[in-house]
A protein has these predicted regions:
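Conserved MFS/SLC helix-loop-helix module at the cytosolic interface between two early adjacent transmembrane helices
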Residues: 57-95
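C-terminal transmembrane helical hairpin of 12-TM major facilitator-type secondary transporters
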Residues: 254, 258, 272-321
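Helix-to-loop junctions at the C-terminal end of transmembrane segments
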Residues: 58-70, 261-273, 357
Length: 398
């Protein structure tokens, strides 16, 4: 197998931009968009949820494209579509128009976020997939912080229209970067359409089926919690401490500590089974959610640190543990099978979170805690399922 140098830094920076502009930004864009369209913020969040469903609808197709054409080409198209969606969003004449723009943004989200970036890393250098995925997510960890600390002043000084146009320009720059990378790497299809290795449910082994269902369930619970909480941290802390500025700081804490978690994974994770790291990560998150019930600012700070570190390691787990059971030749389609139901259910996060949060912060946190406890138990069950990818059977690679 030919191994090529993975453009981990470009892939990592792309995740700051794509997650930040296609998801995190709507925590702050939702209010001015709702005001301009004459609808409630909950309605805008429902539209965002609908856009995220598109990832599930396209997951199987995009997974096949990753295996056939390579992840870098897919990301180029995703950034271009995202630039178009955000650019058109600046016009915001009506709620219907906003929904149409969010449709484009949903397609872009499906084509240029972690799963496609992970596919590129696995295809280019499978033996070093865990380290490369860790580096990619290391960058992505600051996406929420960079976005929330940037979008607020942009909205204040430039208004909604110019802010959306500015975000569109950043997406266009990302499309250009992946066009350059595609030419540099000359990333031909790993297999032609006729030689693409067969991959369908009926030919999977029992171990592969269990791994696929379990990882799909874990990531579904994790992303449902992630999408629900991301939209309401600022609201929750604003109400709890009656200080909007403090709320933004607290909400922004978990981004840098995702980076800390991923740094720990990069430096020390290779000493441990990636599945065990996943168990620890999923345990940190319900612990953090429980601590947030406290009225002490210091406890809230510690909780967001733990939540961020858990989320940081867990993202690496999603990307790499899949590769323990599925080789590079079928990785894209395996992820596609996992993402399809996950994306549809996780897309309900903003709207489900809105409904739960309307009942109060405590019920909201109880439900999120329960979801992550379920994810932790499922992750622990994978420890009894031996890896099947021969490349990672050596302890140093798992």
């Amino acid at each position: 197998m030919q191994h090529r140098r993975v453009p981990v830094h470009s892939l990592g920076i792309s995740q700051i931009v794509s997650f930040g502009l296609l998801f995190y930004a709507f925590a702050q864009l939702k209010a001015p968009l709702a005001q301009s369209a004459g609808v409630s913020e909950t309605t805008i969040l429902a539209a965002v949820s609908g856009a995220l469903v598109i990832q599930g609808m396209l997951a199987l197709v995009i997974g096949r494209w990753i295996d056939r054409f390579g992840g870098l080409r897919i990301m180029q198209g995703g950034f271009l579509i995202g630039a178009l969606g955000l650019g058109l969003l600046s016009l915001y004449p009506s709620f219907v128009w906003i929904c149409a723009c969010l449709g484009l943004i949903g397609v872009s989200y499906a084509m240029c976020t972690y799963e496609v970036a992970f596919g590129s890393a696995v295809q280019l250098d499978e033996p070093k997939a865990r380290r490369n995925i860790s580096i990619i997510t290391f960058y992505g960890g600051v996406g929420s912080t960079v976005t929330w600390l940037s979008v607020a002043p942009m909205l204040e000084f430039f208004g909604l229209q110019l802010t959306c146009l500015g975000l569109a320009v950043l997406m266009l720059m990302g499309a250009w970067r992946f066009w350059v990378l595609g030419r540099h790497y000359q990333q031909e299809a790993p297999h032609s359409s006729l030689a693409l290795e067969p991959f369908r449910w009926s030919i999977l082994t029992q171990t592969e089926k269990w791994a696929l269902v379990t990882m799909g369930s874990i990531s579904t619970l994790g992303y449902l919690t992630f999408t629900a909480t991301s939209m309401f941290w600022i609201n929750l802390f604003s109400e709890k401490f009656a200080d909007p500025a403090l709320a933004v700081v607290l909400a922004s804490l978990y981004g840098p500590f995702q980076v800390v978690g991923r740094w720990v994974e990069m430096k020390f994770g290779h000493r441990f089974d990636a599945r065990l790291s996943g168990v620890v990560a999923t345990l940190l998150m319900p612990l953090a959610l429980t601590m947030i019930h406290s009225d002490a600012v210091e406890v809230a700070v510690l909780a967001m640190i733990l939540f961020g570190m858990g989320q940081g390691v867990l993202t690496v787990t999603y990307g790499f543990v899949t590769n323990l059971y599925f080789r590079a030749a079928v990785y894209g389609r395996a992820k596609g099978m996992m993402i399809a139901p996950r994306a549809v259910i996780a897309a309900l996060g903003p709207s489900l979170g809105g409904l739960l949060y309307a009942q109060g912060a405590d019920p909201f946190l109880y439900v999120m805690t329960g979801l992550m406890l379920g994810a932790m138990l499922l992750m622990a069950s994978l420890l009894r399922l031996p890896p099947t990818n021969e490349i990672h059977l050596q302890p140093s690679n798992s």
